[in-house]
Curated annotation (Swiss-Prot):
Residue(s) of cross-link: S-(2-aminovinyl)-D-cysteine (Ser-Cys): 19-22
Covalent link location (Lanthionine (Ser-Cys)): 3-7, 16-21
Protein name, as recorded: Lantibiotic mutacin B-Ny266
Source organism of this protein record: Streptococcus mutans
UniProt entry keywords in alphabetical sequence: Antibiotic, Antimicrobial, Bacteriocin, D-amino acid, Lantibiotic, Plasmid, Thioether bond
Length: 22
């Protein structure tokens, strides 16, 4: 999993790694 710091503000699910941040 990617680090939470790489998550975009608002948790935009545009990237495959962002889905893990939500």
């Amino acid at each position: 999993f990617k680090s939470w710091s790489f998550c975009t503000p608002g948790c935009a699910k545009t990237g495959s790694f962002n889905s893990y941040c939500c």
